[in-house]
């Protein structure tokens, strides 16, 4: 849930609510209405009017870890889009590690690091001075070769097209962005134009001053509609008030089917062993099939389960019994993960995987501050003059919230969630490798061609009530 930090006022400064509200899933296509750009996916740099108030250019390109290793760029992919995808993956692992450090090892974690990155890129449109510099550095945007901060938005548009505008319709892909702005405020036209063209975020005026409660209900209803009722009443009473200037909302919904489904007839109750040594009952799915798999460093098992269409996969990382998942999480780097994925080979497997549903909701403010994004959240230091027409310097982000949802079952959707039938047809063939996720696992959902981490999390407690 959203805390009451939204819309607070400090030292006479007005706060902007950055609200990345997420339901697990793949992003939908970027669509822009009443835009001079007919199709952002085919547009050239000169076609997209990316002219924010301030531009940041680093003195030299900053290298990310392991960048010297050669990786093949996918066909028909702009090199800068590829670098942006890598930058997002570096941010993903760094942010995840900060978040995991703040949580108990028995807590489930789930988030969309790509969505957090995109939401703050939208905020970056209006940023200047050190606020802009920190946004570039924390989100690793400054690792993209010889490009300035304004061009990042063009590359984001192209990345979104590669990720979400696909011919494959075997998964349900829904995404929506929206800016809810105070109707008494005149917003910078360039900020509005770029937000709509690049990110599909239209501005909807609301009467924060005259009717804050109705504004809250309107935003909550919009979120509920865009997430098919999965996320409701996200913004609590009193969270929106007369001092609120802007609420930025991002929603994501995903519904995908396994390429190789688990038969419900093979699902049964088994024990799941949590990090604290306690055990609990889960519905354990089972199947025997060929999957991309590898036993990597220190006997950690890595398994890739494709969704229909093969362009999106779920990667499961299971440490050996003697090693905690927390240890693997802290050692993980984007280059290590890439190396593991490159080593996966088709293997005949016996897969035991819990059926589960996890939700996670948290403020990203503390983790981002620890990573160096400090000025944006400071009433005294924040510089966001490019958001409102008069170029005001009294805006800051009071807090930033993220909510994510993941459900895994035999179909890859909600179907047959309550059916438990006795085990049938389980093989005892000793020649087959076993992947048994009856203890905490790391979960990633990625786009294969660009190796973009779309979602990331930890299943530490999938237990049945």
Swiss-Prot record:
Modified-residue entries (Phosphoserine), positions: 69
Signal peptide range in chain numbering: 1-32
Keyword Signal among UniProt keywords: yes
Chain positions carrying an annotated carbohydrate: 129, 168, 188, 225
GO cellular component, one term: extracellular space
Record's keyword terms, sorted: Blood coagulation, Disulfide bond, Glycoprotein, Hemostasis, Heparin-binding, Phosphoprotein, Protease inhibitor, Secreted, Serine protease inhibitor, Signal
Disulfides per UniProt: 41-161, 54-128, 280-463
Binding site for heparin: 82, 162, 178
GO BP: blood coagulation; regulation of blood coagulation
MF-aspect GO terms: heparin binding; serine-type endopeptidase inhibitor activity
The UniProt record lists the keyword Nucleotide-binding: no
Compartments, as annotated in UniProt: Secreted, Extracellular space
Expression sites (tissue/organ): Plasma.
Origin superkingdom: Eukaryota
Family recorded in the similarity comment: Belongs to the serpin family.
Subunit comment: Forms protease inhibiting heterodimer with TMPRSS7.
Name of the molecule in the record: Antithrombin-III
Naturally occurring in which organism (per UniProt): Bos taurus (Bovine)
